[in-house]
Regions:
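Recognition helix of helix-turn-helix/homeodomain-like DNA-binding domains
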Residues: 26-41
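Short, basic-rich loop-to-helix N-cap that marks the start of a DNA-contacting helix
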Residues: 38-51
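The alpha-helix within a helix-turn-helix
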Residues: 11, 22, 50
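A short, Lys/Arg-rich alpha-helix, primarily the initiator
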Residues: 1-19
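Key DNA-contact positions within bacterial/archaeal DNA-binding proteins
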Residues: 19, 30, 58
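Short, charged recognition helix plus adjacent turn
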Residues: 9-13, 34, 61-68
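Residues that mark the N-terminal boundary/hinge immediately upstream of a DNA-recognition element
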Residues: 17, 42-45, 56
């Protein structure tokens, strides 16, 4: 399972609000909503987020392995 908690932690650490993401960085509300609910986003979006936030992919998401 992919979890986007690191993304929201990164935003907090950098002092970036959801409003700023949408207005200054052009990220859609739908993308933020998908991430808030741990739904999929494209690799292109991950790449763009890394460029915008000057961070690495692990600052955007983490993979949680389900125990069988």
């Amino acid at each position: 399972m992919i979890n986007y908690k690191p993304f929201f932690d990164t935003l907090k650490r950098k002092g970036i609000t959801q409003y700023k993401l949408e207005t200054e960085y052009g990220l859609s509300k739908g993308t933020v909503d998908n991430m808030r609910h741990n739904r999929s986003i494209t690799l292109y979006t991950v790449e763009e987020l890394c460029k915008m936030l000057k961070c690495e992919p692990w600052d955007i998401f983490e993979i949680i392995v389900d125990k069988v």
